[in-house]
Amino acid sequence: MRSDMIKKGFDKAPHRSLLKATGLKDEDFDKPFIAICNSFIEIIPGHKHLNEFGKLVKEAVRAAGMVPFEFNTIGVDDGIAMGHIGMRYSLPSREIIADSVETVVNAHWFDGMICIPNCDKITPGMMMAALRINIPTVFVSGGPMAAGKTSKGEVVDLSSVFEGVGAYQSGKISEEELKDIEDHGCPSCGSCSGMFTANSMNCLCEVLGLALPGNGSILAIDPRREELIKEAAEKLKVLIERDIKPRDIVTEEAIDDAFALDMAMGGSTNTVLHTLALAHEAGLDYDMSRIDAVSRRVPHLCKVSPASNWHMEDIDRAGGISAILKEMSRKEGVLHLDRITATGQTLRENIAHAEIKDKEVIHSLENPHSEEGGLRILKGNLAKDGAVIKSGATEVKRFEGPCVIFNSQDEALAGIMLGKVKKGDVVVIRYEGPRGGPGMPEMLAPTSAIAGMGLGADVALLTDGRFSGASRGISVGHISPEAAAGGTIALLEQGDIVCIDVEERLLEVRISDEELDKRKKEWKRPEPKVKTGWLGRYAQMVTSANTGAVLKVPNFD
């Protein structure tokens, strides 16, 4: 066993002595040592229940004849961090999580790992670590939150609260109505109830094969999640016995399948960023052109909030992720069904008995929302290395208009609230990319303000930053190269005409190459917003969004 490095041989007597101080007995040194990588944090509702959850995982690991050791990672609640300096720390926290998990697990030579993530950057951070460490691993997330209901019976979620702010600001609802939405938008523990980033990543984790069937959709408060815990411990033991590791599971084909589900469900645009980072950790050469190829062959079968009033509980009721995959598998060339997963079985075996139980929630191949996926990769002179739009969250497929430029999210939100943005405008929020932000903050507050004011179909928004999974409308993010790197978005001037064509996958500014070259020569990079601390280091090390915004390793040659 891998853990023999710290427990076998006469020279490991000091190690065993220390381990006995934690409560271990001599007989425990013949069992696999399992890292329980938890993320219990009281300020994050998606993680509030994970302390008790971790206890159940440890019980299941002991029952399976293994020895559990629990530790916790950090985490950032993107909703609470939204709209202020806290959002700059969100994406960088992914790297800290990956590094911290790698540190604990490799320092102590664990034989296997069960990861308990739930919210936005915690899930991809742990997945990156699992691929980096590459020991048998099973993920079992904390589960989605239920949707809420206002006193009038209206179904609401976190995106409803954000949009309620814009609606109140524009006089569309009263302060009492906003308070009603606020009080009921997040009714329980769990990851926010729509197809936002957390649930998108937990669903993708299931499809990749690192998590068990049901992981993405079973609610946090559902007793079936306890059964999932027990099964996770049993399956981990099998993975250890068969030496099946994350890099055996997360192949290029598995990533294709993860993006295929993403396209079928219209997941968060953040999945592109995180899954490219996973490919990097797995040592795979996977780029945005391959994502676009998946988008072209996968129909959009589900619309989940913010694209509709359906939530994760409805997906679960309709058959879960397995039912969506089973329906997708009817179309030749969409899924790779014979690859191994954390169950020890193939994807084909995992979904064999799944079926759609509600075709209003999960559409059939014969009745898709659209023939192509709910995410699109756009390119053009404004995004030479690519940009991403959640096409399933807008009915508008082509938009052209003059740009209104803001050099930060705060500046943009203030401008929107003051009425500086009109119908037909293209809002540009720049210098918010991985380097420029720094940290590539999400633009949920501006998109929600625009939607809440009733301009969601009449105003487009472009940024080198990110969007929350709760964002909707004509929102194009991840524009690469970013402004801080001298990308075309940095060269835009007030009133320039921008064209967004979703069907043609085009993002262009209507000015000549000669004019762009002239502006590029005159452009000067602004001073970094942050020069010290973690964010200062991050800004110097981070790469572009089109490569997953991973950190570059210095060249020591």
From Swiss-Prot:
Residues engaged in binding Mg(2+): D78, D120, K121, E442
Entry keyword Plastid: no
Residues holding [2Fe-2S] cluster: C119, C192
Superkingdom of the source species: Bacteria
InterPro entries cross-referenced by the UniProt entry: Dihydro-acid_dehy_C, DihydroxyA_deHydtase, DiOHA_6PGluconate_deHydtase_CS, ILV_EDD_C, ILV_EDD_N, IlvD/EDD_N
Cofactor(s) needed: [2Fe-2S] cluster; Mg(2+)
Keywords carried by this UniProt record: 2Fe-2S, Amino-acid biosynthesis, Branched-chain amino acid biosynthesis, Iron, Iron-sulfur, Lyase, Magnesium, Metal-binding
The UniProt record lists the keyword Membrane: no
Protein family according to the UniProt entry: Belongs to the IlvD/Edd family.
Assembly and oligomerization: Homodimer.
Name of the protein in its database record: Dihydroxy-acid dehydratase
Organism of provenance: Bacillus cereus (strain AH187)
GN (gene name): ilvD
